[in-house]
């Protein structure tokens, strides 16, 4: 995370160099740890840093529906003791607030909405955090170009 931009901000005489993006990436990493299924033989925790984002993959499937995760407010941790321990040392927010924290940070930057992908065949979950506006604009342009054709089709 060292190459993420850090603004110069002072609170009194102390420099504050953590941004909502830093907090969101850390939250993604914490979620990777507390929601992993460590009993799976084939599973491995994986973090990939790209020039334009991050990808976090952990073994196990989601314990809540995607819609509920995106909405926030609920958590069903696979490793609640680990979650409690991390919160006690200052990592992680209130239960159920982590994913909305990520969504808010990305929305404020105008970046592509974070994508949570559940692969039930490989039994793994991947969080994709793209730090770009491109895909968002491409989707918008595609929708605008095809708006009329979508309106005409009735299913």
Spans of model-derived segments:
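C-terminal regulatory or interaction extensions
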Residues: 1-155
């Amino acid at each position: 995370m060292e190459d993420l931009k850090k603004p110069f901000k002072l609170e009194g005489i102390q420099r504050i160099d953590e941004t909502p993006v830093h907090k969101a990436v850390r939250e993604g990493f914490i979620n990777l740890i507390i929601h992993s299924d460590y009993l799976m033989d084939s599973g491995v925790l994986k973090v990939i840093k790209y020039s334009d984002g991050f990808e976090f993959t952990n073994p196990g499937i989601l314990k809540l529906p995607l819609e509920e995760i995106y909405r926030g407010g609920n958590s069903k941790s696979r490793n609640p003791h680990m979650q409690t321990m991390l919160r006690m040392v200052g990592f992680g927010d209130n239960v159920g607030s982590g994913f909305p924290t990520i969504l808010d940070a990305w929305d404020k930057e105008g970046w592509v909405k974070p994508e949570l992908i559940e692969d039930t065949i490989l039994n793994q979950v991947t969080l994709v955090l793209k730090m770009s506006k491109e895909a968002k604009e491409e989707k918008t342009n595609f929708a605008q170009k095809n708006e009329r054709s979508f309106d005409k089709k009735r299913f």
